[in-house]
C-alpha cells in the first residue's frame, strides 16, 4: 500500500467521502484532463477545492493523465488511484483539433453518470458546494449544457494585463448577450454525456469553444449564470505584461475566432 503524507491522507479521506457508496451510481461525474508536463502540481489544489463540497450528492472524479513517455508513467497515477479517484492513463492523446477536449473524451466515456462536469487541472473553485449543486440542478431542470462565469487568478501586475482582461470579458459578454452565441469554455462547463460524445464522434466539436454553438444548433437547452458564488478561477500564470504583448494578443485572438468559429455548426439530430 502506498504511504501518503498527512496532507494527502486527509485529502484521500475527503475524496472517498465525496464519492460515497461505490455500489450506487454517482449524482454527477467530474472529468479533469491532467497534462503531466504542466498539471501534476496543480491538480492537488483543484482536488482540495472539490473535497470541500459539503452537501449530500455523490460525486465521481475521473482524471485523464496524459502526455508522458509510454515507458515512464508518472508515479502519481497509482497515487491518485489509491486516493479513490478513477484514473485513465494515456501516454499520447490522438487529436485532430484541440488536445484538451480530446483528452476529456476518454474520461467522459468511462463516467458512471450521464451528468458530466468539466474542469481544467489549473482551475480553482471558491465555492464547490454551490457550483456542483447548481450544475446538478440544471441537469434536473432538463438543461443539456450549463456554464458559469470564469475569472482569472495568478495574474501578473500591470495596466496592460487589466486591459486584456477587460477586452476578454467584454468580448465574451458581447458574443453571449448580443450575438446569442454560448460562450462555454473548456475550464468550466457541464454537459450531458450523450450530447458531447455524439457531437465529438461526428467531428463537430474539435475544440471546447464549439460545444456551446453545437449544442444550441441541435435545439439543446443551455443555462448560464454569472453569480459570484458560482465563479470558477482559471490560471493566468502564462500571461505576460506589456503593451506589445497586448497588441499581439488582440491580433491573435481576432484571428483565433476567425479560424475556429468561421464555420457554423451544421444541423444535427441527437438521438434520444
Regions found by a protein language model. Name each.
Residues 146-159:
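Short beta-strand-to-loop element that shapes/binds the nucleotide-sugar donor at the catalytic cleft/hinge
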Residues 93-111:
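Glycine-rich, basic loop-to-helix element that forms the pyrophosphate-binding segment
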Residues 1-49:
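N-proximal low-complexity "stem/linker" segments adjacent to membrane-targeting elements
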Residues 225-244:
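Active-site donor/metal-binding and catalytic loop motifs
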Residues 114-124:
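Short beta-strand-to-loop acidic/aromatic patch adjacent to the donor-nucleotide binding site
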Amino acid at each position: 500500500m502506498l504511504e501518503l503524507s498527512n496532507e494527502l491522507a486527509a485529502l484521500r479521506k475527503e475524496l472517498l467521502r465525496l464519492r460515497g457508496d461505490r455500489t450506487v451510481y454517482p449524482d454527477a461525474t467530474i472529468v479533469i484532463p491532467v497534462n503531466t508536463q504542466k498539471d501534476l502540481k496543480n491538480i492537488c489544489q483543484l482536488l482540495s477545492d472539490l473535497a470541500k463540497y459539503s452537501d449530500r450528492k455523490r460525486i465521481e472524479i475521473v482524471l485523464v493523465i496524459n502526455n508522458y513517455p509510454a515507458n515512464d508513467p508518472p508515479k502519481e497515477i497509482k497515487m491518485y488511484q489509491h486516493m479513490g479517484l478513477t484514473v485513465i492513463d494515456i501516454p499520447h492523446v490522438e487529436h485532430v483539433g484541440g488536445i484538451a477536449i480530446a483528452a476529456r473524451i476518454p474520461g467522459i466515456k468511462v463516467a458512471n453518470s450521464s451528468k458530466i462536469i468539466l474542469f481544467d487541472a489549473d482551475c480553482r473553485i471558491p465555492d464547490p458546494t454551490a457550483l456542483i449543486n447548481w450544475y446538478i440542478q440544471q441537469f434536473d431542470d432538463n438543461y443539456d449544457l450549463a456554464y458559469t462565469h470564469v475569472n482569472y487568478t495568478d495574474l501578473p501586475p500591470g495596466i496592460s494585463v487589466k486591459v486584456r482582461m477587460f477586452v476578454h470579458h467584454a468580448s465574451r459578454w458581447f458574443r453571449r448577450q448580443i450575438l446569442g452565441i454560448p460562450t462555454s469554455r473548456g475550464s468550466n462547463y457541464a454537459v450531458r454525456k450523450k450530447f458531447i460524445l455524439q457531437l465529438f464522434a461526428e467531428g463537430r466539436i474539435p475544440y471546447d469553444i464549439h460545444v456551446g454553438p453545437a449544442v444550441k444548433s441541435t435545439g439543446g437547452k443551455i443555462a448560464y449564470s454569472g453569480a459570484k458564488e458560482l465563479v470558477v478561477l482559471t490560471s493566468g500564470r502564462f500571461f505576460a505584461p506589456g503593451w506589445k504583448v497586448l497588441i499581439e494578443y488582440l491580433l491573435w485572438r481576432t484571428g483565433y475566432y476567425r479560424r475556429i468559429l468561421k464555420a457554423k455548426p451544421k444541423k444535427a439530430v441527437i438521438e434520444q
